[in-house]
Amino acid sequence: MANLYMYFWEKIKVWRKEVGDFMNLHDFVHGVDPTIKLVIEDEFPGTRCVGGKYVPSTHSIFLYEKDIKIQCRHLFGSNECLESYQWIILAHELGHALDEDLLSLSAKFDQTEDIGLLYQIECNAWEIGKKLIPFINSELFSFIKDESLAHYHKEMDKIS
């Protein structure tokens, strides 16, 4: 995993020299893995507020702009850190896309419905994602990650 991190960090440094400090999300995803498709839509088609999702069957990441704004406002009371929040959501979804264990963990979950497996899937995505965006404030990243994982902690506490 350390080699993967160093590989991506070196790519990020090169990209930042080429495009300055601003990098768009599509270019970033393409630089990480050109086989991943990024789709940015206005809002999630269901009733839940979903900022992003990864679809393994199409190797696609979907980001939902309105939902990301709603989540950011809900967590922080404003959209002051919206750009960083969007990068964090993208990095998390990239974490799913790059997780070599995702398919096997998902298959095990389908068989067992063990919430611990879902928690592991999410933790893997957060761990991988964090390494992709060292230019984002680490305390902000940790806060968002912890908020995201809180639901799983509550569910696992009910079981034990």
Predicted regions: what they are:
Residues M1-H59:
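A metal-dependent hydrolase signature that marks the N-terminal structural subdomain at the beginning
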Residues Y85-L102:
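Active-site recognition of the HExxH zinc-binding catalytic motif
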Residues E100-E127:
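Post-HEXXH active-site segment of zinc metalloproteases
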Residues G77-L90, D114-Q120:
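Glycine-rich, flexible loop segments associated with nucleotide phosphate handling
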Residues K13-W15, C72-E80, F109-D114:
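Short, flexible/disordered intra-domain loops and linkers
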Residues I40-S84:
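Active-site scaffold of zinc-dependent metalloenzymes
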